[in-house]
Amino acid sequence: MKTSERAAGGSAAWPPAADWGERLVRGLLWLFSFLPLWLLHGIGSLTGRLIALIPNRQRRNALINLALCYPYTSDAELIRLRNRALREFGKTYLEIAPLWLRAPAQALALIREVRGAELLRQDDGRGLIVLSPHLGAWELAGLHLAAQGPTAIFYKPQKYLDDLIVGARRRSGATLAPITARGIRSLVLSLERGEAVGILPDQGPRGDKGAVFAPLFGRPAWTMVLVSRLARRSGARVIFMFAERLARARGFRIHCLPAPQDIDSADDLEAATALNLGIEHCVAVCPEQYLWTYRRFRDRPAGTPKVYTGGLSDRAALATAARLRSLAAASSE
């Protein structure tokens, strides 16, 4: 148990927005899509610096996450890493504009290198499950995967900008499978045909089914078990892939990594632990580019305290993380 704190091809469709806020976001995305990458990253980095200066929940949550995941790192280094992560956070959301709104070929031209490309080959006729964490430019990772051949993307419909996101992903040639029983059946069929399936593995599943608490950086994280079940049912291989953002807006480097052993285990905890270990291996390459602002530990084992609480200052965030670490250590004795 746990407790919890559209059109393919052509240009993106722009139906009337639900409110002026969404209209403004759409307009900014359209404007940003024309800007060069160096300017987008410059604006994004500046935005991240501003977020780091003003006490806010994003800043606090990122520091709590880092302090929980890197318990032996000094407070000063955690704050430095958090500030770097916020600058990368800003770049992530500025570069989404051209990735969504430019032609896929233009976005793919930003890829400078692919490491581990042999893992993407499907010479044996088996399906391929590609896990892309919220690391670097995950939208570009999805575009690269779709460019390799028939691809289905496991997709959570969004409250805002959903048609824009759907249209961008479909223009890449991918099909979208919603997070429903029907969507899961669609993924199974794709894998049985020897196609690729893309999944964001570090989203906290909703509800009490289809997930277990498994260690992520040594902390219990509510983790999906869908990947192991898909792999066992279809016989598909599993790998990890992400797009690292290169310095000075030089483009991106794709990394393909083998999945840890046991990721297809029939034991849900073993499989989820292996999945989270694979995420850790990816994050180790460029930890500042992980989405540390995401409330990954929002869902908690019953009887344990909430994570994202307390004051917004750095001192308060570090104190919250220290208290949680102390409680976890005491409960394990």
Locations of regions flagged by a protein language model:
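Membrane-anchoring hydrophobic helices of lipid-metabolizing enzymes
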Residues: K2-S132, A137, D162-G167, R171-G173, ...
